[in-house]
Amino acid sequence: MAFIHLDVGFLYTLLVCTAFGSMLSNAEIKVNPPQDFEIVDPGYLGYLSLQWQPPLFPDNFKECTIEYELKYRNIDSENWKTIITKNLHYKDGFDLNKGIEAKINTLLPAQCTNGSEVRSSWAETTYWTSPQGNRETKIQDMDCVYYNWQYLVCSWKPGMGVHFDTNYQLFYWYEGLDHSAECTDYIKVNGKNMGCRFPYLESSDYKDFYICVNGSSESQPIRPSYFIFQLQNIVKPMPPDYLSLTVKNSEEINLKWNMPKGPIPAKCFIYEIEFTEDGTTWVTTTVENEIQITRTSNESQKLCFLVRSKVNIYCSDDGIWSEWSDEQCWKGDIWKETLVFFLIPFAFVSIFVLVITCLLLYKQRALLKTIFHTKKEVFSHQDTFC
């Protein structure tokens, strides 16, 4: 028994010493942060490259495959984006209206340390575009609409208090273009560039679309404005057309319309229907181009509806409602309205003809009476001479 007790005690001591030795060994292992960490702007209007070089390693760790933990954000953001990578660079889009900060450390995996993972200290860097011009000189009310998923149009207003000689230029870039491009079809107001009609944009969907609008003036520097869009989220479709309203029976009504023309697939639409029954209006939505509704009263005399469309959540995160379609209506008791429509003018004309006839008859009677009275006087004179 004493031998067994001694053996267990020895094993316990050995385990404690091994664990302590391993902890001591790991505590002594240190790894350096990556070198030459920087943010590089290749001129893509906000699509930046974060890049670095491997840290300096002791010879016994050179065969280890290390990873890097990268964190970055715009300076006014509360949340960091975190990336774990084995590469020496990472690219992402940023709002260049604000500053950017990033930090990175080295992760030495557990298999290289015979223990737990080892992290280096952080290497940090920041990036700002070169500031120029007062904030008030930036354009205002930038508005971009991707009409029918085919034609992109952007418009803006001039900055506050800018000199009359100020003019603006728009540049854009998205992944697939070799370099940023300038607008070739400006919308002009009083000779100044206040918008842009873009050319056909090939393969531009579901990726960041970067825009910069800067300006020039001989009187003052103009601060540029930067924007990032996802084009599928600013699509404004055409309104639906060929609406039909069918009253099936005393209660059921069928509303139907054609999907908007253009390249947008049928599965990508959601429709908003505004239905009016005798002055009472309600609104509903559907992803189909047909809907059945129930009349609130089978004695309702007028039913009307109109429809508009938008790209739904299956094809985009957001969208812009189209204009409303033309209104389509149904009216009950149409024979009564038809009779009233024709009866009133007919009655008016009949009364008018009757009055004219009476006047003519009265005039004719008066004329005959005058002629008869004249003839009677002539005959009286002839009797006297005889």
Swiss-Prot record:
Extracellular domain ranges by topology: 22-338
Entry-linked SUPFAM superfamilies: Fibronectin type III
Disulfide bonds: C64-C112, C144-C154, C183-C196, C268-C315
Annotated tissue distribution: Expressed in kidney, placenta, liver, skeletal muscle and thymus. Expression was not seen in whole blood and heart.
Subcellular location: Cell membrane
Keywords from the UniProt entry: Cell membrane, Disulfide bond, Glycoprotein, Membrane, Receptor, Repeat, Signal, Transmembrane, Transmembrane helix
Full protein name: Interleukin-13 receptor subunit alpha-2
